Amino acid sequence: MPIQPSGKETEEMEAEGDSAAEMNGEADESEEERSGSQTESEEESSEMDDEDYERRRSECVSEMLDLEKQFSELKEKLFRERLSQLRLRLEEVGAERAPEYTEPLGGLQQSLKIRIQVAGIYKGFCLDVIRNKYECELQGAKQHLESEKMLLYDTLLGELQERIQRLEEDRQSLDISSEWWDDKLHSRSSSKAGDAMPPSKRKKAPLVSGPYIVYMLQEIDILEDWTAIKKARAAVSPQKRKADGP
């Protein structure tokens, strides 16, 4: 059989049950209070967050405006400094004191000196070449003049000799013609005298041994042919001398 508790124990157990129920009720109430306080704190924190956000936003905007203002001031200051530096450099360049101007200027002046020296040397060479060319042309002109003078002298000498030869031939032809006419006249006079002489006293033609040329022409025709041959030979001889010459 099961053992039943006594009355005292039963009362104690009931008292303990009531105290446990009271404790549970208090715990529930504390939890409700805690949840309520949390809700209130959350509402308060949300309100505080909005205010903090606005406050921080306004602070950030003000800081940004300050930064923009400082940046504009720095930018303006930098612009003024750069402008003053450029003006200073411009003044130095105008006064020929700027290193950006003096250093390249020194290099250019050195290059100018070198180029002037090279130009002077080149000028000397050009003058020597021109002088040598002038002397060569002058010498060539003198040689050409001398050769032309010699050629002219030879030409005139040949022409004069040709004229002298022609005059000599003409004189000889005239002498021959005069002799021929004298002989002709003498022969005519002698033939007339021979006709008057008796045939026994006439001279007989001499007999010639060896080659003998019998001319079928009259003496006047032979004389004309001989004169023409002499003139032709006199005309050919100067041309032959020119062809044989240099």
From Swiss-Prot:
Keyword Cell wall biogenesis/degradation carried by entry? no
MF terms (GO), sorted A to Z: NF-kappaB binding
Output compositional bias ranges, type Acidic residues: 11-32, 40-52
Q: What are its GO biological-process terms? A: apoptotic process; negative regulation of cell migration; negative regulation of DNA-templated transcription; negative regulation of NF-kappaB transcription factor activity; negative regulation of stem cell population maintenance; negative regulation of transcription by RNA polymerase II; negative regulation of transforming growth factor beta receptor signaling pathway; positive regulation of anoikis
Map out region (Disordered) in residue numbers: 1-57
Tell me the Pfam families matching this sequence. Sds3
Provide the protein's localization: Nucleus; Cytoplasm
List the InterPro entries hit by this protein, alphabetically.
Sds3
Q: Which GO terms describe its cellular component?
A: cytoplasm; nucleus; Sin3-type complex
State whether keyword Coiled coil applies.
Answer: yes
Protein keywords? Apoptosis, Coiled coil, Cytoplasm, Isopeptide bond, Nucleus, Repressor, Transcription, Transcription regulation, Tumor suppressor, Ubl conjugation
Q: How is it modified after translation?
A: Ubiquitinated by a cullin-RING-based BCR (BTB-CUL3-RBX1) E3 ubiquitin-protein ligase complex containing SPOP, leading to proteasomal degradation.
Residues in a coiled coil are 51-98
Highest taxon, organism lineage: Eukaryota
Q: Which location does the Swiss-Prot or TrEMBL entry give for the cross-link Glycyl lysine isopeptide (Lys-Gly) (interchain with G-Cter in SUMO2)? A: 184, 242
Query: According to its UniProt record, which protein family does this protein belong to?
Result: Belongs to the BRMS1 family.
Q: What is known of its domains?
A: Contains an N-terminal anti-parallel coiled coil formed by two BRMS1 chains; this region can form homohexamers.
Q: What's this protein's function?
A: Transcriptional repressor. Down-regulates transcription activation by NF-kappa-B by promoting the deacetylation of RELA at 'Lys-310'. Promotes HDAC1 binding to promoter regions. Down-regulates expression of anti-apoptotic genes that are controlled by NF-kappa-B. Promotes apoptosis in cells that have inadequate adherence to a substrate, a process called anoikis, and may thereby inhibit metastasis.
User: Sorted alphabetically, which PANTHER family does this protein's record hold?
Assistant: BREAST CANCER METASTASIS-SUPPRESSOR 1 (PTHR21964)
Query: What quaternary arrangement does the UniProt entry report?
Result: Homohexamer (Potential). Interacts with SNX6, HDAC1 and RELA. Interacts with ARID4A. Identified in mSin3A corepressor complexes together with SIN3A, SIN3B, RBBP4, RBBP7, SAP30, SUDS3, ARID4A, HDAC1 and HDAC2. Interacts with SPOP; this recruits the protein to a ubiquitin ligase complex containing SPOP and CUL3.
Please state what the protein is called: Breast cancer metastasis-suppressor 1 homolog
Q: What is the protein's species of origin?
A: Mus musculus
